[in-house]
């Protein structure tokens, strides 16, 4: 009798399974609705806040991360796997640097040259990819495509060696060294002196932008900046990336990519560093200890990380910059964000979403159709380029000695 009750023909198991499945789906949707869907937190001084909220509605709207992959690590991974690759054609510029190196700038070609505005005054979006990234990365292509659709020029600054070109010197790139970025900005401003320039730095590129702003202050050559998933504190970043799961998913693959770049340029790099020792690195910290700190003249990795962390330099920034980060970013923990400093800064605004991961920010059921970061660029660039008068007189909020510097 019991066997007949449990038999498949009875339908009990099927009904029970259907009921449990429906309950699981209901609980999942309930959790998503109650805990995942949140408005981002916008942290800024009152003047900058008053500019951003009406001009960038995305900063006050609920973020709807993709229903079936809202966890931070999944967002980070699926962004690479799922997003489409827009067709972008580039024309490359090769710049020579004072130390004998070379830089590759990729200028995106306008889709319809007959509709081009005056290039001498057309706004320019300068994009800086993440570590080992280039103009061919999916996230870069989407941002470039957005800039082109909005009627701006778009140019990508590729870090040395990241487009496959050979290094001319032993130096590749370093988060604390902004000399190459200064060279690029000066080149663009010399070529288009009347065109407003907005820098968009992603991850490692965002660190470069923040450090450049802090070092150059008003002479940064930019009207504003947007940084996406940048890391404010190098010590907290490496600590987070060295946890077991993050190490497996992110730290080890990134370190392998860095080692490949060194291996490709062995002949020029081995003059300064022990290549074989560098290639044994299994973490970014080990790579920075064995290569980056040596190549760029730092005593050790600790000294380098202190110089590379923008967290302690926020008070030196004198150009408006909007920073986007997710609270579940495996590269940049919330504890590393300069929230208190941003609350008192006239120039720095932090936009913190509850979900999004690292350069993830996938949204909607079909995340390859729309992207949160592209929408943010659209609204922020429009506000900066088309309504510069709407920006408050931020310099007036500074002490008199800073206004005159």
Swiss-Prot record:
Segments forming domain AB hydrolase-1: 123-364
GO biological process: medium-chain fatty acid biosynthetic process; medium-chain fatty acid catabolic process
Gene3D superfamilies assigned: alpha/beta hydrolase
Chain ranges passing through the membrane: 17-37
Catalytic residue list: 203, 329, 358
Keywords, alphabetical: Glycoprotein, Hydrolase, Membrane, Serine esterase, Signal-anchor, Transmembrane, Transmembrane helix
GO cellular component: membrane
Top-level taxon: Eukaryota
UniProt xrefs under PROSITE patterns: UPF0017 (PS01133)
Membrane topology recorded in Swiss-Prot or TrEMBL: Single-pass type II membrane protein
E.C. numbers: 3.1.1.-
InterPro entries membership: AB_hydrolase_1, AB_hydrolase_4_CS, AB_hydrolase_4_sf, AB_hydrolase_fold, ABHD4
Localization of this protein: Membrane
Tissues and organs where the protein is expressed, per its UniProt entry: Ubiquitously expressed.
GO MF terms, alphabetically ordered: acetylesterase activity; monoacylglycerol lipase activity
Main localization of the protein described in the UniProt heading: membrane
Entry keyword annotation includes Transcription regulation: no
Glycan attachment positions: 10
Signal peptide feature range: none
Entries under SUPFAM superfamilies matching the protein: alpha/beta-Hydrolases
Family label: Belongs to the AB hydrolase superfamily. AB hydrolase 4 family.
The protein's name in its UniProt record: Protein ABHD1
High-level lineage: Eukaryota, Metazoa, Chordata, Craniata, Vertebrata
């Amino acid at each position: 009798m019991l066997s007949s009750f449990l038999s498949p023909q009875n339908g009990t198991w099927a009904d029970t399974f259907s009921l449990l499945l429906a309950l699981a789906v209901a609980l999942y949707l309930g959790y998503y609705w109650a805990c995942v869907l949140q408005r981002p937190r916008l942290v800024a001084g009152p003047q900058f806040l008053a500019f951003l909220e009406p001009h960038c509605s995305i900063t006050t709207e609920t973020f709807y991360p993709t229903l079936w992959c809202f966890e931070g690590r999944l967002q980070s991974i699926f962004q690479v796997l799922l997003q489409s690759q827009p067709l972008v054609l580039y024309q490359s510029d090769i710049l020579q640097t004072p130390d004998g190196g070379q830089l590759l700038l990729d200028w995106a070609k306008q889709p319809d040259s007959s509709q081009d505005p005056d290039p001498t005054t057309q706004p320019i979006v300068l994009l800086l990819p993440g570590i080992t990234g280039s103009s061919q990365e999916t996230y870069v292509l989407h941002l470039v495509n957005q800039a082109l659709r909005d009627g701006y020029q778009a140019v990508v600054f590729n870090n040395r060696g990241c487009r496959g070109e050979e290094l001319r010197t032993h130096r590749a790139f370093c988060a604390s060294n902004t000399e190459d970025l200064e060279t690029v900005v000066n080149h663009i401003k010399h070529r288009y002196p009347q065109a407003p320039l907005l820098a968009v730095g992603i991850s490692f590129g965002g660190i470069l932008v923040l450090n450049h702003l802090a070092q150059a202050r008003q002479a940064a050559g930019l009207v504003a900046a947007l940084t996406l998933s940048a890391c404010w504190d190098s010590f907290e970043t490496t600590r987070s990336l060295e946890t077991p799961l993050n190490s497996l998913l992110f730290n080890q693959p990134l370190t392998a990519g860095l080692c490949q770049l060194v291996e490709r340029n062995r002949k020029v790099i081995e003059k300064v560093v022990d290549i074989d020792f560098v290639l044994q690195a299994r973490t970014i910290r080990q790579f920075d200890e064995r290569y980056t700190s040596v190549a760029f003249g730092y005593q050790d990795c600790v000294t380098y990380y202190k110089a590379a962390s923008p967290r302690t330099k926020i008070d030196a920034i004198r150009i408006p910059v909007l920073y986007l980060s997710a609270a579940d970013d495996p590269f940049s923990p919330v504890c590393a964000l300069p929230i208190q400093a941003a609350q008192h800064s006239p120039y720095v605004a932090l936009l913190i979403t509850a979900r999004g991961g690292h350069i993830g920010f996938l949204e909607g059921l079909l995340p390859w159709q729309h992207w949160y970061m592209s929408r943010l660029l659209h609204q922020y660039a429009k506000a900066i380029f088309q309504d510069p008068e709407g920006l408050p007189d931020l310099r007036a909020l500074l002490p008199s000695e800073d206004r005159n510097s």
